[in-house]
Amino acid sequence: NDENYKSADITYYSPDGTAVSPNGSNGDDDTNESSSTDEYSNYRYSYSTLAKTVMTQALRRNTEFRQASKQRQEVILYAMQYIGNKYVYGGESITDGIDCSAFTRYVMRHFGKKLPRNSYSQRSSGKSVDKPNTGDLICYSGHVAIYIGDGKIIHASNHHAYPRGGIKVSSSYKYRAVRSIRSLFND
């Protein structure tokens, strides 16, 4: 079942036969933040590519996603291509590092939707809704994410290497207190 898929379910092996975790560490240090030029970077890349494939396939079973408008679905599919990209606080580069509000702004701008630069200001964008729909913004204190459907979000999470951080899908939008839910769509 793809929905119960966890990064720990995958073991990669380096060229010398040493088992490495998907984040490129040997499992001894869960805070490994090695650069993308190290010998294990291709394993992280392979893992994020696999994660994108698994997540995209899982969307077919996501009831809310399937029932959403075409534009809302396109927002999610567009955002998901960046799974595994790096998080940088204050960053605005989708390739070199981006923070949560710059990520939501980047994704929505692709669809002609304007958002302010910081998460606090994004809490006032669009219209307030009580229940999230695919493509809506989930606003927290100091953080913002895009709702996928069936309780899941995509967001630029934190500075840790993917899959622990970076741009990723999280399984519950209620993982912390929600301040507001904002819709930028007219449907």
Positions of the model-derived regions?
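Intrinsically disordered, low-complexity
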Residues: 1-86, 176-187
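Solvent-exposed, acidic/flexible segments
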Residues: 65-72, 96-101, 131
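Secreted/periplasmic proteins that engage bacterial cell-wall peptidoglycan
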Residues: 74-118
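...with weaker cross-activation on analogous glycine-rich loops/strands in unrelated enzymes
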Residues: 77, 105, 109-174
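Residues that form or immediately flank small-molecule/cofactor binding pockets and catalytic motifs
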Residues: 92, 158, 186
